[in-house]
């Protein structure tokens, strides 16, 4: 049986040595003058865990400094725990400047989609350039939605690729998630999360009109996602009920915006958009003149808001020509019995959305602060609180291996809303101003409000949660850090593994990990330092030292505790 020796050195630090018979050329531990130690050439940072072979019983910190020592030794691991150690580890991670974006995990493949998915015979919906089908992952049996677009019908393929690029950049609870794309000689396939609750349009047709409290629930989501888009200089240009889907059939289901086919990047406040795009009932007057800005979305949302409350549009006619003529005049009324019990605050917000002068028209961030939302607040999971387990998960996430953080981000991205229901609701409550992200101050405030004591190194933890270095906590970043790794299903772990395993051969190579890590995450060429970083990430979890990671090693990595 191999010996595990804990030995105090002259400087008062603690060395952990694995002792067994070996040749001089096969040293078990190589020492350096730093916080790093090595086991068989595997770099171990203070406070971290690594995968080891059968002869190596150690998983954890190799060096410890401080007067108080808490050393836990068992068959599988040796851990040295101390708040100062944890702080040192977080500081070393911050100095390493390891940052990445989730968009790099949305991969594009060439080949046959049906090698991986079974498509439904009947489409869920039809569009100008193709259809949307329900798709079932052949191996994992997970349901997705697949938009199948014919290249022959596409008038402008580069324009369509811009739609894909826009979707890759979006990370918001009210935006349908793009998961991966496929392309063959005839078609392009967009694999997205599946929404089963139907269109907002269908619900309006069925219901007729809605009470103000439910309308506020819908409009807050619409203004929130528009605020998110406009902050990123993206104009949707086709806001209408048909382009919002309910995630599921539950009464409190969120809505998701879809179809970015007409979306466009813009320069803030300039009237540089010229293309006449949109749908007659919802199109803004400036679009018809051929010179408009992002506030065309606010006009369209005002029309949608009007319809929610009464069941019919403010501008109507027997033909598109008549409808557009009414839009150009911009005249509408709040007459009819449907408006008798509608509040003045609701009417005021509609008026501010349907202001003819775009410069005076309300923007999404202003709309979210309108008094109507406070008066007609929809009580959607407003009692959602963060418990101590979420804070513990944040702390654990900060100490994860780089590879593990990548995997947790992919799992958060691949998870459906059912898997993260409570965390999603918590995120929405914390996002008080509806920007689609949480500031570090908002997260601190939310934790303290729920009676949780923040660790003294919380700012360092936040830097680790902010994986793309944007200075704020995006939706997927929050979910990735808050997820309980003990609750991860084998299916979700395999979902992440399969993203890394680009060629689908059952193993993750250095080249594949580099492709994932730097795909869309790095400007310029990959340097030797980047390559060395990836090699270290592989080495940290490569249990059998073959230079590759199989699913067993990957699964074991995801189970490591701290």
From Swiss-Prot:
- Enumerate the InterPro entries for this protein: CDPK_Ser/Thr_kinases, EF-hand-dom_pair, EF_Hand_1_Ca_BS, EF_hand_dom, Kinase-like_dom_sf, Prot_kinase_dom, Protein_kinase_ATP_BS, Ser/Thr_kinase_AS
Q: Where is the EF-hand domain?
A: 418-453, 453-487, 488-523, 529-562
The region called J domain is annotated at 393-428
Q: Where is this motif: J domain autoinhibitory motif?
A: 393-401
Give binding positions for Ca(2+) 3.
Answer: 542, 544, 546, 548, 553
Binding-site positions, ATP: 124-132, 147
Q: What is its EC number?
A: 2.7.11.1
Q: What is the activity regulation comment for this entry?
A: Activated by calcium. Upon calcium binding to the EF-hand domain 2, the C-terminus of the junction domain (J domain) undergoes a conformational change which results in the dissociation of the pseudo-substrate inhibitory motif from the catalytic domain. This, in turn, may facilitate the autophosphorylation of the activation loop at Thr-279, which leads to the kinase activation.
What UniProt keywords are attached to this protein's entry?
Answer: ATP-binding, Calcium, Cytoplasm, Developmental protein, Differentiation, Kinase, Magnesium, Metal-binding, Nucleotide-binding, Repeat, Serine/threonine-protein kinase, Transferase
Residue numbers annotated as active site: 238
Q: Which residues form the Protein kinase domain?
A: 118-373
Q: Which positions does the motif J domain EF-hand interaction motif occupy?
A: 402-411
SUPFAM superfamilies reported for this sequence: EF-hand, Protein kinase-like (PK-like)
Q: Where does Ca(2+) 1 bind?
A: 466, 468, 470, 472, 477
Main localization of the protein described in the UniProt heading: cytoplasm
Keyword hit for Calcium:
yes
**Which family does the similarity line name?**
Belongs to the protein kinase superfamily. Ser/Thr protein kinase family. CDPK subfamily.
Comment, domains: The EF-hand domain 1 cannot bind calcium due to the presence of a Lys instead of an Asp at position 435 and a Gln instead of a Glu at position 442 preventing calcium binding. The EF-hand domains 3 and 4 probably bind calcium constitutively when calcium levels are low, while the EF-hand domain 2 binds calcium following an increase in calcium levels. The junction domain (J domain) is composed of 2 motifs that maintain the kinase inactive. The N-terminal autoinhibitory motif acts as a pseudosubstrate inhibiting the catalytic domain while the C-terminal motif binds the EF-hand domains.
Query: What function is annotated for this protein?
Result: Calcium-dependent protein kinase which acts as a sensor and effector of intracellular Ca(2+) levels probably in part downstream of cGMP-activated PKG kinase. In the mosquito midgut, regulates the gliding motility of the ookinete which is essential for the ookinete to invade the midgut epithelium. However, another study showed that while required for ookinete invasion of the midgut epithelium, is not required for ookinete gliding motility.
The protein depicted here goes by the name Calcium-dependent protein kinase 3
Species assigned in the record? Plasmodium falciparum (isolate 3D7)
């Amino acid at each position: 049986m191999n010996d595990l020796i804990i030995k105090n050195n002259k400087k008062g630090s603690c060395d952990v040595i694995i002792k067994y018979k070996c040749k001089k050329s096969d040293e078990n531990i190589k020492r350096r003058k730093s916080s790093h130690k090595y086991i068989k050439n595997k770099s171990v940072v203070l406070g971290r865990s690594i995968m080891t072979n059968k002869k190596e019983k150690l998983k954890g910190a190799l060096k410890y400094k401080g007067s108080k020592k808490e050393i836990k030794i068992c068959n599988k691991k040796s851990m040295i725990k101390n708040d100062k150690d944890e702080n040192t580890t977080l500081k070393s991670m911050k100095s390493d400047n390891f940052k990445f974006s989730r968009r790099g995990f949305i991969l594009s493949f060439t080949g046959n989609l049906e090698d991986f998915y079974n498509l439904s015979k009947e489409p869920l919906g039809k569009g100008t350039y193709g259809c949307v089908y329900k798709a079932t992952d052949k191996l994992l049996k997970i349901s997705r939605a697949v938009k199948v677009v014919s290249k022959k019908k596409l008038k402008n393929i580069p324009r369509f690729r811009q739609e894909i690029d826009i979707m890759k950049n979006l990370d918001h609870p009210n935006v349908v998630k793009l998961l991966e794309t496929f392309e063959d000689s005839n078609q392009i396939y967009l694999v997205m999360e599946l929404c089963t609750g139907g269109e907002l349009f269908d619900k309006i047709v069925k219901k007729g009109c809605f009470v103000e409290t439910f309308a506020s629930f819908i409009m807050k989501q619409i203004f929130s996602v528009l605020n998110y888009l406009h902050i990123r200089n993206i104009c949707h240009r086709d806001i209408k009920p048909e382009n919002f889907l309910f995630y599921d059939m539950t009464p409190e289901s969120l809505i998701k915006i879809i179809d970015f086919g007409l979306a466009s990047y813009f320069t803030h406040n300039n009237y540089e958009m010229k293309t006449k795009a949109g749908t007659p009932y919802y199109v803004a007057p400036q679009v018809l003149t051929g010179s408009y800005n992002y506030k065309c979305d606010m006009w369209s949302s005002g029309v949608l808001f009007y319809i929610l409350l009464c069941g019919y549009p403010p501008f109507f006619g027997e033909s598109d020509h008549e409808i557009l003529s009414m839009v150009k005049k911009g005249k509408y009324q709040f007459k009819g019995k449907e408006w008798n019990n509608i509040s003045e605050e609701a009417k005021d917000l509609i008026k501010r959305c349907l202001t003819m002068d775009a410069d005076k028209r309300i923007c999404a961030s202003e709309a979210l602060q309108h008094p109507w939302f406070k008066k007609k607040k929809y009580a959607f999971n407003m009692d959602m609180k963060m418990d101590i387990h979420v804070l513990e998960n944040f702390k654990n996430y900060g100490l994860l291996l780089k590879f593990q953080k990548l995997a947790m981000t992919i799992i958060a991205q691949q998870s459906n809303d059912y898997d993260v229901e409570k965390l999603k609701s918590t995120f929405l409550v914390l996002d008080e101003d509806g920007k689609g992200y949480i500031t570090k101050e908002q997260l601190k405030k939310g934790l303290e409000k729920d009676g949780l004591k923040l660790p003294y190194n919380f700012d360092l933890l936040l830097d680790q949660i902010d994986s793309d270095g944007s200075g704020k906590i995006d939706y997927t970043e929050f979910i990735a850090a808050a997820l309980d790794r003990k609750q991860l299903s084998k299916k979700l772990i395999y979902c992440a593994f399969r993203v890394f395993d680009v060629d689908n051969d059952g193993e993750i190579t250095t080249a594949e990990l580099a492709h994932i890590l730097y795909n869309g995450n790095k400007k310029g060429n990959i340097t030797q330092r980047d390559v060395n970083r990836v090699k270290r990430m592989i080495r940290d979890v490569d249990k059998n030292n073959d230079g590759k990671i199989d699913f067993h090693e990957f699964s074991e990595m995801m189970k490591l505790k701290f």
